[in-house]
A protein has these predicted regions:
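C-terminal and inter-domain tail/linker signature
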Residues: 1-158
């Protein structure tokens, strides 16, 4: 399969989230469960395997913006070549800050998400995702400052 088709199937799975159970998205169908690498921005870091990814990023992110909608990005760039694919959006999604994130309590604000994702596939599964998020702008969009995170007032990293 072309990496774009594998990626698109995974994105459709993200839309199946029932708001409670991560398995409702069936990510195990799309990722190499044991060997996947997810490399995120400074505040999250490198996660290996689906379990670690879901525990340290996906579950927290979904708590932060459970109503996320990635179909609303104004400017999207999508490309794929063989076993690689990329997706960028400015903004990448619309959402509402509804849960604690990096120690920031929800205030109902609409965070801005500028994201660039780069994926590698190994046949039928995604194996790598380099996910770059403008965290400084994300924090500012919910009226928080980067320094609050850096000063150690918040603890997110495992």
């Amino acid at each position: 399969k072309d990496c774009w088709q594998v990626l698109w199937n995974m994105i459709k799975g993200l839309r199946d989230y029932d708001g409670v159970n991560l398995p409702s998205m069936q990510m195990d169908k799309h990722w190499d469960v044991d060997h996947m690498h997810w490399v995120g921005p400074f505040a999250i870091g490198h996660l290996k395997g689906l379990v670690e990814f879901q525990e340290y990023h996906q579950s927290r992110f979904l708590s932060f913006v459970p109503d996320r909608d990635g179909s609303t990005g104004i400017n999207k760039i999508i490309f794929s070549d063989g076993n690689q694919a990329a997706l960028m959006g400015h903004p990448s999604m619309s959402c509402t800050h509804k849960g604690n994130y990096f120690g920031f309590e929800p205030e109902g604000k609409q965070p801005r998400m500028f994201v660039m994702d780069f994926w590698t596939c190994d046949g039928e599964r995604l194996v790598d995702n380099w996910c770059q998020i403008d965290m400084i702008d994300l924090f500012r969009s919910i009226n928080k400052e980067y320094e609050e995170f850096i000063d150690g007032k918040l603890n997110y990293i495992k």
